[in-house]
Amino acid sequence: MAADQRPKADTLALRQRLISSSCRLFFPEDPVKIVRAQGQYMYDEQGAEYIDCISNVAHVGHCHPLVVQAAHEQNQVLNTNSRYLHDNIVDYAQRLSETLPEQLCVFYFLNSGSEANDLALRLARHYTGHQDVVVLDHAYHGHLSSLIDISPYKFRNLDGQKEWVHVAPLPDTYRGPYREDHPNPAMAYANEVKRVVSSAQEKGRKIAAFFAESLPSVGGQIIPPAGYFSQVAEHIRKAGGVFVADEIQVGFGRVGKHFWAFQLQGKDFVPDIVTMGKSIGNGHPVACVAATQPVARAFEATGVEYFNTFGGSPVSCAVGLAVLNVLEKEQLQDHATSVGSFLMQLLGQQKIKHPIVGDVRGVGLFIGVDLIKDEATRTPATEEAAYLVSRLKENYVLLSTDGPGRNILKFKPPMCFSLDNARQVVAKLDAILTDMEEKVRSCETLRLQP
């Protein structure tokens, strides 16, 4: 332990005294004190190494040397706001444009996903002249007041649903109303959006936007059925609204097959607005909104300047460019496909072996493991999931849960997560699940004894 480093207990005591308890820690019963990270590994104050399965912010790996170097070199020369001409912002916008459909060709740079989604909401309202938003159940789009209002995950615990917010069912084919045995779940779930829109219109409401993560994360690592977004976009645009794809958790090659998760819905589907954050800067605060020309021009026509003090700074754009360079140089998109497929295969074997594993779903390095109490009802195994995550931490694997029932193990590791990491993590998962089952059998045996 470094000589100038506080003991863990002192750090915890200071945090409890100085930092609001609403700013929560992972593993609150026994928090991990992380002092260093590299690649897909994190290290505590004692030097113990943890495999990081959840830091999708450290997209190309914690403290990637090329990203660190890019930030350092630019910071030594200039860092200022975007009101001055500078090559970095236009170079970065051009590189991003090469990854997107040509219609998405106007860019705004910001500092966080919340800022990006807030701006997307403003753009949608200016373009359409409408107010209302359709969102998916249990969605989360950010911590600003405007975004809490369109995040059922949050607003149900606060002031409740605003009259201008309309909630459609998650397109969850495992535990939603239209499941894997439905002949056309994409159409069925899209028709639910159509029904929500019609209900709003009957009340005199006008739809500005449909907001959705391209792969709902907080909702439980959901993979929407192919064709769902195209049909939703048709219903929304017919009502005069636009489609906003939130790529903050899932963009930049994480899904492997495509650079953007919305592209899983087919080459003909193009959102009107795309928001980016988290992984875009590999830990540096960067975010972006990409919009079509008509949407951007309507915003410009208001005559109101959009200015963000740090958004699009030379350092932020240098970092963003470095992340794109690493993704390309290290072929991390292909890596996500191969390692993600292998991890899905290993987790699928756990589903066969352990009844608690109800479903394994995912694409690339975005994977969810749905833990259940019984197969017939698919009741979320919430307590078991929490216990499992705690045991994995004791075995130096950092994982967390999500979903309405907090029973979905979510895998969103840095993109350098390896085949060997997959083997290690699943081996530890298997051992803990086996131990849990043996303890249950032991308790049942004791109950059966006279």
UniProtKB/Swiss-Prot annotation:
It comes from the Eukaryota. It catalyses: (5R)-5-phosphooxy-L-lysine + H2O = (S)-2-amino-6-oxohexanoate + NH4(+) + phosphate. It is an enzyme of class 4 (lyase). One of its GO terms (molecular function) is identical protein binding. It is found in: Mitochondrion. Pfam families: Aminotran_3 (PF00202). Its EC number is 4.2.3.134. Its main location: mitochondrion. The modification N6-(pyridoxal phosphate)lysine is found at residue 278. GO terms for cellular component: mitochondrial matrix. CDD domains: OAT_like. InterPro entries: Aminotrans_3, Aminotrans_3_PPA_site, PyrdxlP-dep_Trfase, PyrdxlP-dep_Trfase_major, PyrdxlP-dep_Trfase_small. Belongs to the class-III pyridoxal-phosphate-dependent aminotransferase family. Homotetramer. Catalyzes the pyridoxal-phosphate-dependent breakdown of 5-phosphohydroxy-L-lysine, converting it to ammonia, inorganic phosphate and 2-aminoadipate semialdehyde. This is 5-phosphohydroxy-L-lysine phospho-lyase. The gene is PHYKPL.
